UniProtKB/Swiss-Prot annotation:
It comes from the Eukaryota. This is Signal peptidase complex subunit 1. The modification N-acetylserine is found at residue 2. It is found in: Endoplasmic reticulum membrane. One of its GO terms (cellular component) is endoplasmic reticulum membrane. Component of the signal peptidase complex (SPC) composed of a catalytic subunit SEC11 and three accessory subunits SPC1, SPC2 and SPC3. The complex induces a local thinning of the ER membrane which is used to measure the length of the signal peptide (SP) h-region of protein substrates. This ensures the selectivity of the complex towards h-regions shorter than 18-20 amino acids. SPC associates with the translocon complex. Interacts with SBH1 and SEB2/SBH2. The chain crosses the membrane at residues 29-49, 51-71.
Length: 94
């Protein structure tokens, strides 16, 4: 079974489209972790779950504003398409 999965894995190539997407994902994870940490500290200091959830919600919205739009610096490096390893003859299906 392992050999079958390795064969399928060699034939299927799913790279991340842009190297900038890696940076964006790392930025997203880092900002959400910092937001969660700050929210926990604020919530603990105020002894309020409402403050914690509000602070985390604000950090999520800020992260969305920074990460979600297609800013030009996300597309600085051009996309290299993966070349298919399997050739399909579409003429035989006509």
């Amino acid at each position: 079974m392992s050999e079958i999965l390795q064969d399928v894995q060699r034939k299927l190539v799913f790279p991340i489209d842009f190297p900038s997407q890696r940076k964006t994902e790392k930025f997203q994870q880092l900002s959400l972790m910092i937001g969660a940490l700050v929210a926990c500290i604020l919530g603990f200091a105020q002894q309020s779950l409402k403050v914690l959830l509000t602070a985390y919600g604000i950090s999520c919205v800020i992260t969305l504003i920074c990460v979600l739009p297609a800013y030009p610096w996300y597309n600085k490096q051009k996309l290299r398409w993966a070349q298919p390893k399997i050739e399909i003859n579409v003429d035989q299906y006509d």
